[in-house]
A protein has these predicted regions:
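Cell-wall polysaccharide-cleaving catalytic domain and substrate-binding groove, primarily
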Residues: 1-38, 100, 118-121, 132-194
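...with weaker cross-activation on analogous glycine-rich loops/strands in unrelated enzymes
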Residues: 2-4, 41, 45, 53, ...
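Glycine-rich, acidic and aromatic/proline-enriched surface loops and short helix-turn segments
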Residues: 11-19, 54-61, 107
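Cysteine-nucleophile protease catalytic domains, especially the papain-like/related folds used
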Residues: 29, 33-58
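A short, polar/proline- and glycine-enriched secondary-structure boundary/capping micro-motif
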Residues: 122-128
């Protein structure tokens, strides 16, 4: 099965990092614009929902237009079981309005693995406590069974006898496709021209 179009768009942004200090990251400002919030001019404003909305827009779908992660609890249709690409909405602290949103790429009993924006100030895959999950959502069209596999931990073992990590496999495939490989050289800044 193919990955959903919004996931292809999100993987293409993998590694974008927020500018530290003065100045703003053009890619992050573009996420605000594409999500319908061209009024935001600084990347210091929380941008996980902007990233989610921008990736949906790139796939020809409307997001919520809000910068509130929890706004996605009312978007699309609810999912009972997680699918790769599902919009996962999480709680954040004790504030009933605060949250985080990203795209589900894997899960196990304890953790959800999300591809999302503003995760350690970057577009990355990060693990979150599964107890924080408030809801999983899916666009009204296409149906999840048409494009996405259930998100679960892999049971296959790697050459070291440990369980294979499906999130690592996805990330590695992306790096190999986009960058042509990787290096252990600490002076190599990465990128396709190196």
């Amino acid at each position: 099965m193919d990955q959903p179009a919004w996931m292809a768009a999100a993987w293409a942004e993998f590694g974008v990092r927020e500018t530290l200090g003065p100045g703003n990251t053009p890619a992050v400002l573009a996420y605000y614009r594409e999500a319908g919030r061209a009024d935001i001019k600084q990347d210091a404003v929380a941008w996980c929902a902007a990233f989610t909305g921008a990736m949906l827009a790139r796939a020809g779908m409307a997001g919520t237009g809000s910068l509130l992660a929890r706004s996605y609890l009312d978007w699309g249709t609810p999912l009972e079981d997680g699918r790769v690409g599902a919009v996962a909405v999480l709680s954040r602290g004790s504030d009933p309005q605060a949250g985080h949103v990203g795209f589900l790429v894997g899960r196990n009993e304890r953790a959800l693995f999300l591809l999302g924006g503003n995760q350690d100030d970057s577009v990355s895959v990060a693990a979150f406590d599964a107890k924080r999950l408030l809801g999983l959502r899916w666009p009204k069209d296409p149906a999840p069974d048409e494009v996405a596999e259930p998100a679960q931990a892999a049971s296959a073992s790697n050459e070291h006898g440990r369980d294979a990590d499906p999130v690592f496999a996805i990330a590695l495939a992306h790096v190999l496709k986009m960058e042509g490989g990787f290096s252990n050289d600490p002076y190599d800044p990465g990128g396709p021209t190196n």
